[in-house]
Amino acid sequence: MLHNNTAVPPLLEVSGISKQFSGVMVLKHIDFTLLPGQIHALLGGNGAGKSTLMKIIAGIEQPDKGSIKIDGNNVSHLNPTKAHQLGIYLIPQEPLLFPNLSVQENILFRLPKHQADKARMKHLLELLGCQLDLNANAGSLNVADQQLVEVMRGLIRNSNVLILDEPTASLTPAETERLFTQLRELQQQSVGIIFISHKIPEIHQLADQVSVMRDGGIALSGKTCDYTTDDIIRAITPAAKNKPLTDTEKRWSELNDNPQKTSSDLPVLTVTDLNGEGFRNITLSVKPGEILGLAGVVGAGRTELAETLYGLRPVLSGEIKLKQCPITRLKTVQRLKQGLVYLPEDRQSSGLFPDSSLSWNICSLTHNNRTFWVHPTYDATVVERYRQALNIKFSHINQPVKTLSGGNQQKILIAKCLEAHPAVLIIDEPTRGVDIAARNDIYQLIHNIAQQQVAIIFISSDLDEVVQMADRVLVMHQGEINGELTKQQIDVDTIMHIAFGEHKSQQAVSTIKTDKAASC
């Protein structure tokens, strides 16, 4: 790990950056510095503000307040082209390559002739110790090599600030180590690297400096060696309210004709040997009132499984039963009528009608049950019930849903799902992009829904969130269930080991316990 001289002028210096969307402060007076040859890790839960900060540095978003210095010079009105010219390159979590173009064509794409130097490109590859076939189609590369092509696109453009967003999310341990070797080579070339990750062991292995964001601010910042894993986890994890919902906030279950009133040991949903697009051999069950966590890295097949259960993707083989009745061949609308409801990950494109009113959105799943025509008086009653039950903040029921904050949009989506009378509710990344106050509201709401004997499948990439919420966890790895954890076994380290295929569940639990005992 490189030890930098603090007298060296920073490559990047961010001071007092603030930003708000729809009245919600997503960045609050952020200070952030990157030195030459430094790997500065950035961590934080979903909605902490990491992506917004990086988009501002890369010129994709404009700050409301604050200043940015690059190589000691103040810059303003950044856009992506200007950021590239100043040496800043953002490498997204999912590489954005042209799959039908060659590796060389992708690296040199849209470069002016004086920069499209093939000899220099080959020299950079040699410096990094890479063995890429420049003539191969980019679509034929594995994810690790695709990310390397993105790194090369930055370097060939003379970038000295590289921003890597969750670069190891879909990599095997061997691919991760190869990437780290190449990043250390870049350190020796005085390239500064912002490394966004939620994997704390990787941070200790790689980074010189660490900053943790929470609720739009910097909760911790300093030399990585000065902080333990527990220090970082405490900085990341939001402080839960641990306050039960009021009687008014529980009103949805009293008024909404909840179909499942009593507890039962019989599973309400059973899946047997299910195969589909992106997953295989899935067997699971969930009981009324149970929160079943579904964990795994990006690409593990969690969302594909959820969409298949809901009928959005085809079943290749296997069986799905809801309340002991086969639904494998039923269409989505039929599964919905039977009580299987899905709250999708992307609320903007899949869950909500952004330009439509609150009332239309909340009642949209049940309009066909009452004929397709809207009933304003009835809809107003429904909206008012959920306003009180979920503490939704809005001005008028005809207000377009896109004008609400992210947290209130998510509550509208939850209300829409509850109005469909779920027996099973599949929730995919429910707190992505919402602020800390709304996040804690949503945690409490999900617990309350489960208390009404609704079975919940809870999908989240935020492992602390999974630990906090789930009664039981299934961990997916490369499209299969790699392990099951009971409530007593659930912790972040164990989930991570299983999610990356290092251990099966029982082996992971015993290994983690041994490691913790040895460190005491």
From Swiss-Prot:
Its main location: membrane. Belongs to the ABC transporter superfamily. AI-2 autoinducer porter (TC 3.A.1.2.8) family. Keywords: ATP-binding, Cell inner membrane, Cell membrane, Membrane, Nucleotide-binding, Repeat, Translocase, Transport. InterPro entries: AAA+_ATPase, ABC_carbohydrate_import_ATPase, ABC_transporter-like_ATP-bd, ABC_transporter-like_CS, P-loop_NTPase. Transmembrane segments: none annotated. ATP binds at G44, G45, N46, G47, A48, G49, K50, S51. The complex is composed of two ATP-binding proteins (LsrA), two transmembrane proteins (LsrC and LsrD) and a solute-binding protein (LsrB). The keyword Transport applies. Gene3D superfamilies: P-loop containing nucleotide triphosphate hydrolases. Pfam families: ABC_tran. Signal peptide: none annotated. It is found in: Cell inner membrane. NCBIfam families: PRK15439.1 (NF011967). CDD domains: ABC_Carb_Monos_I (cd03216), ABC_Carb_Monos_II (cd03215). Its EC number is 7.6.2.13. It catalyses: ATP + H2O + (2R,4S)-2-methyl-2,3,3,4-tetrahydroxytetrahydrofuran-[AI-2-binding protein]Side 1 = ADP + phosphate + (2R,4S)-2-methyl-2,3,3,4-tetrahydroxytetrahydrofuranSide 2 + [AI-2-binding protein]Side 1. This is Autoinducer 2 import ATP-binding protein LsrA. SMART domains: AAA. GO terms for molecular function: ATP binding; ATP hydrolysis activity. Residues 12-240, 264-503 form the ABC transporter domain. Part of the ABC transporter complex LsrABCD involved in autoinducer 2 (AI-2) import. Responsible for energy coupling to the transport system. It is a peripheral membrane protein.
